[in-house]
Curated annotation (Swiss-Prot):
SUPFAM superfamilies: S-adenosyl-L-methionine-dependent methyltransferases
GO molecular function, one term: DNA binding
InterPro entries associated with the record: DNA_methylase_A-5, DNA_Protect_Modify, S-AdoMet-dep_Ade-MeTrfase_prd, SAM-dependent_MTases_sf, YtxK-like_N
Pfam families per record: N6_Mtase (PF02384), YtxK_like (PF21106)
Record's protein name: Uncharacterized protein YtxK
Gene that this polypeptide is encoded by: ytxK
Family: To type I restriction system adenine methylases.
PANTHER family, A to Z: ADENINE-SPECIFIC METHYLTRANSFERASE (PTHR41313), DNA METHYLASE ADENINE-SPECIFIC DOMAIN-CONTAINING PROTEIN (PTHR41313:SF1)
Top-rank lineage group of the source organism: Bacteria
Length: 329
């Protein structure tokens, strides 16, 4: 049944995006952001379309749409489908969306680790279209959340903005390089699918402990440091990391940084079957920023996660997680 609802919302977004794309001669992904804003504002004037006929057709779509009554997950999933359509020609791994199954699992972890918090502040420093953040926000059980997202790509940011409005999420957006100074108060939790690769701004990297001694620094190392800096003492960070994170030439500094600044709580390897290319396979790393009343767990939660479609194996794994939480938290 949910599939039908998601499909109906997708059709509304897709039809509007195609019309706007053709009329304004812009990319589908840019048109999708405009379509999202149109549905939120419930008007078409801001589009300044050249053809009256298209304005009337969009008006008819607006009259058909009832975004105020749609479940938030329908809207998020519909946007996800439309974004995938618009990005199918973009092969850069750092511009791919975090798969739903992983987003839902990270939501489960956030709820477990932040169980005692009724109000949360959340930062995603590599927001993209916001899919991971909105997945987590939609799954927060009985918690209110103020969230912050940083994204350097203005088109992706516009899509996140359109979704935040339609999902009625309190989200502050920052259009900037996440590794430049951030004017954000420390948050309770950070979630991030780390962009992997080299950071080209050597001068900017000089401000970081985890800068390379020579040559370009790893962006994913700098993202970790920036995230820890903007987390409250005792706060948690949930990263999707490349499986080779601790094997690189720059990993010595990273290990020392972890020892000095955080407690590693969990390292969970994701099923390789999720990833098209095993070279891009990832794990989930859970850190706690050190503070006066924090201590490292007696035992780090280490696991190779089974396929998410294997329900029995996942239930067994979650039972093991519950045991770990009873002992350590």
């Amino acid at each position: 049944m949910q599939k039908d609802h998601v499909g109906a919302v997708y059709e509304l977004l897709n039809e509007a995006a195609i019309m706007i794309k053709n009329e304004l001669q812009i990319s589908y992904i840019e048109a999708l952001a405009e379509a999202g804003e149109m549905y939120f504002l419930e008007k078409t004037d801001q589009l300044k379309l050249p053809a009256d006929q298209k304005t009337k057709q969009l008006q008819a779509l607006l009259e058909k749409a009832e975004f105020g009554t749609y479940e938030h997950e329908w809207v998020r999933k519909a946007f996800q489908l439309a974004v995938l359509k618009g990005m199918k020609d973009i092969s850069h791994p750092n511009r791919q969306m975090t798969p739903d199954t992983i987003g839902l699992f990270i939501s489960y972890l956030v709820n477990k680790f932040m169980a005692d918090k009724k109000e949360l502040t959340i930062l995603d420093p590599a927001l993209g279209t916001g899919n991971l953040l909105f997945t987590v926000l939609n799954q927060l059980s009985e918690k209110t959340a103020n969230s912050f997202g940083i994204e350097i790509d203005d088109v992706l940011l516009k899509i996140a903005y359109a979704q935040a409005n339609l999902l009625k999420k309190e989200l502050e957006l920052f259009h900037q390089d996440s590794l430049e100074p951030l004017f954000i108060d420390p948050v309770d939790t950070v979630i991030c699918d780390l962009p992997v690769g080299y950071y080209p701004n050597d001068e900017g990297a000089e401000a970081f402990e985890l800068k390379a001694d020579e040559g370009h620094s790893f962006a994913h190392h700098l993202f970790i440091e920036q995230s820890v800096k903007h987390t409250k003492p005792g706060g948690y960070l949930f990263f999707m990391i490349p499986n080779h994170l601790f094997e690189s030439s720059q990993s010595g500094k990273l290990k020392q940084f972890f020892k000095d600044k955080v407690h590693i709580n969990a390292l969970l390897q994701l099923p390789k079957s999720i990833f098209k290319d095993e070279a891009h396979a990832k794990s989930i790393l859970v850190l706690q920023k050190q503070g006066e009343n924090t201590k490292a767990p007696g035992q780090i939660l280490l696991a190779n996660l089974p396929s998410f479609s294997n329900q029995k194996a996942m239930l067994d794994m979650m039972a093991q997680f519950d045991e770990w939480f009873k002992k350590e938290k």
